Structures are given as structure tokens and as C-alpha cells.
Amino acid sequence: MDKELLAMLVCPRCQGKLKYDRERAELKCHFDGLAFPIEDEIPVMLEEQARHMDADEKLGKAPGEARDATS
């Protein structure tokens, strides 16, 4: 993914910063809990195409990471 393109892209819902997830080929907005797919190196920035992240992923926890005592 081109770093210059990444620097220009924002979440279409909140205009917040996006985090690039290379493993899943997605751009993630942790504020809104949306993950936008990247297809053939082109970000698909449509809310209808975005995946909704689960609560742990939205908080930035890795899959299988233990929850703290307050969760």
C-alpha cells in the first residue's frame, strides 16, 4: 500500500485516521469500528462494503488476547 495514499485517506464516516492492517488487507477505523477492504491494491472506502469489527478488535486487542479483569 502506497504510504502517500495512506496519509491522504480518512474514514468516510468520521474523517478520522485509518490504520493499515497488512495481514487482513484492510484499512481500519477504530473509532467507528469499521474495516475497509483493499482489493487489488485499491481501498474500497464504502461503508456498505466495510466489515464491522468486534469489540476487542475495535479496542485494538489481538485475536485471542486475554481480556482484563474489568471486561
From Swiss-Prot:
Pfam families: Trm112p
Alphabetical list of SUPFAM superfamilies matching this protein: Trm112p-like (SSF158997)
GO cellular component term, pick one: cytosol
Disulfide bridge partners, by residue number: none
Top-level taxon: Bacteria
InterPro entries attached to this UniProt entry: Trm112-like
Family indicated by similarity: Belongs to the UPF0434 family.
Protein name, per record: UPF0434 protein Csal_1588
Gene source species: Chromohalobacter salexigens (strain ATCC BAA-138 / DSM 3043 / CIP 106854 / NCIMB 13768 / 1H11)
